[in-house]
Amino acid sequence: MPIWSPKGRAAAGVVASVLFIVFFFLPLAVILMSSLSQQWNGILPSGFTLNHFVNALHGAAWDALLASLTIGFCASLFALLCGVWAALALRQYGVKTQKWLSMVFYLPSAIPSVSVGLGILVAFSQGPLQMNGTLWIVLTAHFVLISAFTFSNVSTGLARISADIENVASSLGASPWYRLRHVTLPLLMPWMMSALALSLSLSMGELGATMMIYPPGWTTLPVAIFSLTDRGNIADGAALTIVLVAITLLLMMKLERIAKWLGQK
């Protein structure tokens, strides 16, 4: 049965729906039930309570939320700035040079985050750029891990902008700086906002590298969730997970809506 036939498409849709329910919806539903239950000793939880969410919005958990938002926005904005600059700079080179330089930007995404964290920890624990024990080392790790995705989004958007538009602006006497500010960047803005949304969601959920380098006072939500569940406090960890998922989804939806609005202007 070919996949492009009506029956094939219907079967593929059913399989995709089942896989989505089994591997995404059900685990998330279990986490939600755990966060709302007083105890879970049998097949299903017993009792209903919001105390776990109250705990998730106070004290150390609240500090972890603020730390995740601060690190996520700072690292994402810096990655976006560098991604735009790199994508614009690569346009000046030939196809082969662009291919090899792009591989350099994509390389961090192919390396396990734990390896990135260890490398940054070793590299910046001594010497003139010592950042161990500071916020900067966490920002550096997050920037390295998300920069490839930002660069990819911006490069895709830049490739879809016709060179004729910029050529027309140049023929009308626009300087390179004026052309960048008033032609290229406005057209590129939807992809920039999409890149920001993606990088922010990746930063908010990063755990592997952060576990190795985070300093006191900058515990992120994933680290806090891991610590709670590692101590056996599953319910509070589940509540904090729901908070993380909800905030990340809301931020992504808002940024994607802004990107869609900018694309229609």
Curated annotation (Swiss-Prot):
KW RNA-binding (keyword) present: no
Domain of life: Bacteria
Residue ranges crossing the lipid bilayer per the database entry: 13-33, 69-89, 104-124, 131-151, 185-205, 233-253
Protein name per its UniProtKB record: Putative 2-aminoethylphosphonate transport system permease protein PhnV
Cell compartments where the protein resides: Cell inner membrane
Protein's organism: Salmonella choleraesuis (strain SC-B67)
Major localization class: membrane
PANTHER family found in the cross-reference section: INNER MEMBRANE ABC TRANSPORTER PERMEASE PROTEIN YDCV (PTHR43357:SF4)
Topology in the lipid bilayer: Multi-pass membrane protein
Record key words, sorted: Cell inner membrane, Cell membrane, Membrane, Transmembrane, Transmembrane helix, Transport
Domain ABC transmembrane type-1, first and last residues per copy: 65-253
GO cellular component: plasma membrane
GO biological process: transmembrane transport
A Pfam family matched in the record: BPD_transp_1
Family: Belongs to the binding-protein-dependent transport system permease family.
Function per UniProt: Probably part of the PhnSTUV complex (TC 3.A.1.11.5) involved in 2-aminoethylphosphonate import. Probably responsible for the translocation of the substrate across the membrane.
Alphabetized InterPro entries for the sequence: AminoethylPonate_ABC_PhnV, MetI-like, MetI-like_sf
